[in-house]
Amino acid sequence: MYVMKQSGWLEVICGSMFSGKSEELIRRAKRATFAKQEVKIFKPAIDNRYSTSSVVSHNGSSVDGIAVASPKDIITHISERTDVIGIDEVQFFDETIIDIVTQLADKGYRVIVAGLDQDFRGEPFGVVPHLMACAELVTKLQAVCSVCGSPASRTQRLIDGKPASYDDPIILVGAQESYEARCRHHHEVPRLDVGTTLDN
């Protein structure tokens, strides 16, 4: 990573499920802690897969965190002594999070957010694309396709072992029993209305 001459910036860690986003957020948070910096980690209250408060990766790594229902709640937990702010599963927050992280970075905090850049349909997910555009540093991670072993950039949602329909709800918090990492060619999203295609 390049050296910042001024304090205060935004880092985005993104990718599909099982690509190591939370793991990378935890690594950066622990590294900052080793450097004697005060770190505060947050996650949306909706994400309670492994813990109601700690940020936990699929591999089992964890760091203490604070679950918040609203992005505005993050502000109440930050002090002048705070150096680094981490936010996991940022895609589950509403657009308020964009203003919050922008203000925090402008005030001199190092802000690190991690989240899915695509939903299960393979389309841009919530606030993440906007945050990527505003960030000084974007790290896009890839998983391994569960079908062919190629680099995977997409998240496959499975319902009873079958690909979820395009019309299913976007938000459905789960873990490996509900989702798999897939490459472009093995990512399946059945649609009732196919619309325009390139086929003749």
UniProtKB/Swiss-Prot annotation:
Gene (name only): tdk
The listed locations are:
Cytoplasm
Query: What protein am I looking at?
Result: Thymidine kinase
Coiled coil found in the keyword field? no
Family according to the record: Belongs to the thymidine kinase family.
The record ties this protein, via Pfam families, to:
TK
Keywords, sorted A to Z: ATP-binding, Cytoplasm, DNA synthesis, Kinase, Metal-binding, Nucleotide-binding, Transferase, Zinc
Q: What class of enzyme is it?
A: transferase
